[in-house]
Amino acid sequence: MKHRYLPMTEQDQKEMLDVIGVSSVDELFEDIPEKVRFKGLYDIKAAKSESALLKELTALAAKNKDTNANVSFLGAGVYNHYKPVIVDHVISRSEFYTAYTPYQPEISQGELQAIFEFQTMIAELTGMDLANSSMYDGGTALAEAGMLAAGHTRRKKILVSETVHPEYRDVVATYAYGQSIEIVTIPHKDGVTDIAALKELIDDNTAAVIAQYPNFFGQVEDIQVIGDIAHEAKSLFVVSSNPLALGILTPPGKLGADICVGDAQVFGISEAFGGPHCGFFAVTTKLMRKVPGRLVGETVDGEGRRGYVLTLQAREQHIRRDKATSNICSNQALLALAASVAMTALGKQGIREMATQNIAKTRYAKNAFEAAGFTVAFQGAHFNEIVVKTNKCVKEINKGLIEKGIIGGYPLGQNYDSLKHHVLIAVTELRTKEEIDALVAEMGALHA
């Protein structure tokens, strides 16, 4: 009989059944007990025309409070940045948009070169010796860094600063659980890693110390001090970083980082309700053969022409699974391309200007909140974000803000017991003086 959900004719079905030697479709399911088989039809709406379906989906999408129709001050790892128009044009080209793993370099030079350029730009921004072709996102990149450190040092403890993104820390803990690796949190003091606590916690079983730069609260930490303490204990120093900030801050590679990871979402990748994004992973040369994921290398073919190939693949799952340094055997090539196009379009000066604007506008917001009577929790150098104390539940304040067309900040109380009624406000280069003033005024009214 003709199947309700399969677009094949009865003749198609008959031919297929004949080939496999059964007389009916029902015969294929004889091993499934009759009493557990679904009877009847699913309650699915009748089919619609394409125009009617588009109208319905558009109406559903219109219920979303997006950053096109609203002013966003929400960050916490995913930011509303400027995306050069050329980004979507380039990544929508069919040779990139539909490309798969470039196992055949002779027909994949375009994709391989694009990945190579991404690796080069990330290595330059982070000040590291080399970078891989990308990771799934910043969280998985950080977790892979922790596992690399544990494998390299053959130690079973990782110290993670409390100022690292809470969700990133959760991903690290999930990876560590399966490897029987102990995760110890270094408390924060005044919004930065507590150095005294770090010195007490670190020992000769510590594989790595993980810090964030700038950290989750927007504070620019003195990561060189943290790195020195890690290296004194012969531990690796892992830095999770915002690559946009590295357009103006000293890169982690020059401050002692052994591994630098992060998320390239800030360059040409939409918020997209949290993903997909593009993690990056950069290391010093001594760790080159233990980097997870793919590496693209530049070489010369038999005729002396420059070419690009996947290289050092013995690190990957191409070898025996238990011998691989990581079971991540893919990458976010399309999103890495988006980040590469954005970085290229902006150029060094553009990235520096973009970073400078983020600092300046964050400082303006801090001053505006303090002038309005709010307390900004942590002082010191900020990038992108500040922590503001309120008198009321942050979620209730955010409900009031969205009615005014403003997407409020991240409620820190859900991750930090000591920061109940504190909100993480993100200010990017897209925000104007008028928008910042409106946020402060509306929060002031709701805060009273």
From Swiss-Prot:
Its EC number is 1.4.4.2. CDD domains: GDC-P. One of its GO terms (biological process) is glycine decarboxylation via glycine cleavage system. GO terms for molecular function: glycine dehydrogenase (decarboxylating) activity. The glycine cleavage system is composed of four proteins: P, T, L and H. In this organism, the P 'protein' is a heterodimer of two subunits. Coiled coil: none annotated. Keywords: Oxidoreductase. The glycine cleavage system catalyzes the degradation of glycine. The P protein binds the alpha-amino group of glycine through its pyridoxal phosphate cofactor; CO(2) is released and the remaining methylamine moiety is then transferred to the lipoamide cofactor of the H protein. Belongs to the GcvP family. N-terminal subunit subfamily. This is Probable glycine dehydrogenase (decarboxylating) subunit 1. It comes from the Bacteria. It catalyses: N(6)-[(R)-lipoyl]-L-lysyl-[glycine-cleavage complex H protein] + glycine + H(+) = N(6)-[(R)-S(8)-aminomethyldihydrolipoyl]-L-lysyl-[glycine-cleavage complex H protein] + CO2.
